Regions:
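Soluble catalytic domains of membrane acyltransferases
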Residues: 37-147
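A transmembrane-helix-recognition feature enriched in membrane-embedded lipid enzymes
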Residues: 1-44, 94-99
């Protein structure tokens, strides 16, 4: 897994600045799918499967594990909204920034307007936004219902 992470750092640092968004998206999706394979995780959708080809999609989900982000990106390219503190995390914060994560400073109420504008721009251009409204991960036993 460490080699897979190193591969991502090298590709993003050396190639991403010169690649089209479409090509970067394909690389990200393949990397995420390979990560699921390395971890022996199989994606299974139960119930009514959503049409993931739809443009302008917002995914709203509970956040059980750090794997949620990679699993969703293995199925469909997603730009996530994350707390600004993640940006300063070693390696993962840099990768999140370089792959288009929107960071929000939850201590500054006015930052919501900035992030909302960025989300609108992404959605209006056909992108997909992912949010975890609980704002944290949990073991899943105390998940709160959506209303």
């Amino acid at each position: 897994m460490a080699l897979h992470l190193l591969y991502a750092v090298v590709i993003i640092a050396l190639l991403f600045p010169w690649l089209s968004e479409n090509f970067r998206t394909r690389i990200e999706r393949r990397w995420n799918r390979n990560l699921m394979g390395i971890l022996n995780i199989k994606v299974r959708i139960s119930g009514a499967a959503p049409d993931l080809s739809v443009q302008n999609m917002m995914l709203v989900s509970n956040h059980i594990s750090w794997l949620d982000i990679y699993l969703l990106n293995a199925v469909r390219p997603v730009r996530f909204v994350s707390k600004v503190e993640v940006r300063s995390w070693p390696v993962v914060g840099w990768l999140a920034h370089k792959t288009g994560t929107l960071f929000i400073d939850r201590t500054k109420r006015h930052d919501t307007a900035r992030v909302n504008n960025e989300m609108a721009t992404i959605l209006n251009s056909g992108g997909c936004i992912g949010v975890f409204p609980e704002g944290t991960t949990s073991n899943g036993s105390l998940l709160k219902p959506f209303h």
